[in-house]
């Protein structure tokens, strides 16, 4: 059994700072908020870059 480590991430969206948590396991980044979640692969980016992108997408969808 592996330990999941969640880290805090912040991003700016429409002039507001939004916060969430993300984990990076097996080449995938998972971002979760109280209202939703998104997962994506690195694709040459750092886990932090992917997490910020996913968090902004969740905010755009009204789920952050």
Where in the sequence are the language-model features?
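Mixed-charge, Lys/Arg-enriched low-complexity segments
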Residues: 36-64
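N-terminal acidic leader/helix
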Residues: 2-34
């Amino acid at each position: 059994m592996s330990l999941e480590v969640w880290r805090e991430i912040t991003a700016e969206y429409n002039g507001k700072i939004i916060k969430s948590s993300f984990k990076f396991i097996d080449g995938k980044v998972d971002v979760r908020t109280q209202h939703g979640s998104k997962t994506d692969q690195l694709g040459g980016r750092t886990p932090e870059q992917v997490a910020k992108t996913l968090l902004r997408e969740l905010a755009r969808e009204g789920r952050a």
